[in-house]
Amino acid sequence: SFDVIIANAGVMATPFGHTADGFETQFGTNHLGHFVLVNRIARLLRAGGRLINLSSSGHRYSNVDLQDPNFERTPYEPFVAYGRSKTANILFTVAFDKRHRDRGVRAAAVHPGGIKTELSRHIDPSHTQAIIDQINRHLAAEGRAPFQWKTIPQEAATSVWAGMVASADEIGGRYCENCHVGHIVPDFEHHGPR
């Protein structure tokens, strides 16, 4: 049995491709892989257990498009694909939390923050700075501090906080960042990421 499952496999901004199962690479890896694994082992989570799905602030790039998850009708855009997969992680978290809370198991989606890892290997360094500039514009509009890279312990902190420290009711079905519940995106207030 498990106390906590942290679903943390992921790729970002990959060239267009498909998984061995035929799904667009990012959606298949970042969302469907977690979805299948977690649902196969969910019964092993003890009462009081938690599921932590690693998502990203990149969920803001796109909603999920279940009519065209493999980009068969729309041009492939790496960050749109990444956003779709990370939004799907959050929506899965909300549904998992609703489905399992009666048995004492809760779920949270976590944005670990920006950290320099192999995750960004497909991104040109000049594009990275453009992304940071865009993030900082959004943060400034929200009255928040500018982006800073995190260390590995800082990156892990929100997963540990949501999985072990925060109250279950505080994090259940919610999106967390910087060891707090994240800001609500108004369009999703009643039916999605909270």
Regions found by a protein language model. Give the residues of each.
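C-terminal helical subdomain
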Residues: 85, 134-186
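Rossmann-fold NAD(P)H-dependent dehydrogenase/reductase core
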Residues: 1-128, 135
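Short, intrinsically disordered, charge-balanced linker/junction segments flanking boundaries
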Residues: 1, 187-194
